[in-house]
Amino acid sequence: MLLRTQLFGKVYEFGSIKELLARANEEKSGDRQAGIAAATVAERMAARHVLAEVPLEVLRWYPVIPYEVDEVTRVIQDGVNETIYNEIKGWTVGEFREWLLADTTAGDMIRRVSNGLTAEMIAAVTKLMSNLDLIYGASKIRCTAHANNTIGLKGTLASRNQPNHPTDSVTGIRATIYEGLSYGSGDSVIGINPMDDSVDSVMRLLEMTYEIIQKWRIPTQNCILAHVTTQMEALRRGAPVGLVFQSLAGSQKANEAFGINVAMLDEAYALAQKYCVSSGPNYMYFETGQGSALSAEAHDGADQLTLEARIYGLAKRYAPFQVNTVVGFIGPEYLYDAVQITRAGLEDHFMGKLTGISMGCDACYTNHARATQNDIENLAVLLTAAGCNYFMGVPMGDDAMLSYQCTSYHDTATLRQLLGLRPLPEFEAWLEDIGLMKDGVLTAKAGDASFFLR
């Protein structure tokens, strides 16, 4: 297929689908660093003009990393529903965009079509969307899942209670969990990034968090975000695991840099289904983020947005309870400033929902990025309007272990009140029962961790 157009008297030609996708991407410092970004705004617009005319089937024919050499590609391609794909393969990317945004296209129609898509199709249509398009398109799609409660229901906004501690102090973590719970944070998960990845330390944190959940009869789940092999061993030893976690990348080589592969994830999923203490049927938790493959020198010339879309295609194999992009965590080398972080957050959320997974966002930034807490609050409002399933909850938005800034316990409570949303229904009923919430609003008892020391 000839990938060529003329714009303002200049001819632009692109050598491959991979190159076209990269040139059509919004400005990202990571793509610029990789040497694959459009040289000018005019070239970017020319690439989008060409991309809009590409049939979806061509994007399936030419994945950014060949089927023969990459197991992520194989997972995505082999998972396509061929009946649905055959119905839509003749659509151009531009026609697909118009269909997604049309008032006559409902969320259940999009959920059905998602089963006939590949990651490259999802990435391509995302590149043709404005920020408002991404918000509106994502708002149509509801992706629910269930562990001990149901996430993703219309009218709800969940929060991960993230009580990280620089030394994994059980006393410090317990106090932080209580503070988060007192603000209504923790309905998606009580999830800890451990400093110590050893099995014994992870088991200690699993037992402590499970004890809190059991003592207070909290309708939620726990998760310790250690390497998946550590969690697998903890499961084998009988630890009370609610969700099994792993960070994912969009290429086989990048996942190998993370110390994982599809066979390992398959084994972890099977163990989770057999031994997790949650009711299920969804037991997995994944985190993602644009730029991870580039940081591992494993991008194979593909742009970071397309590789991110491929992560969601891999995640879908495991019917996860929740997935979130950690959108500004890697730093300004990949997303330079608030403009790029905001764009990537909206892109990732839209692509996750279009893939068909329960999607949240860690709206965050590092201290050397050109971003502030106000920018993260702005992104959180936009994502909430887009129907984001959950955010992180960190004391005052400052993670003392990971040394980055994100959303606070207060932020989710404010977003719920601002936009008329509620916690997950089982969790809200629990908050009401213990006196921390009434009619969807926190009571005077909220915000005081000592409430749980009675």
Regions found by a protein language model. Name each.
Residues 1-174, 182, 187-454:
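Anaerobic metallocofactor- and corrinoid-dependent redox/one-carbon enzyme cores
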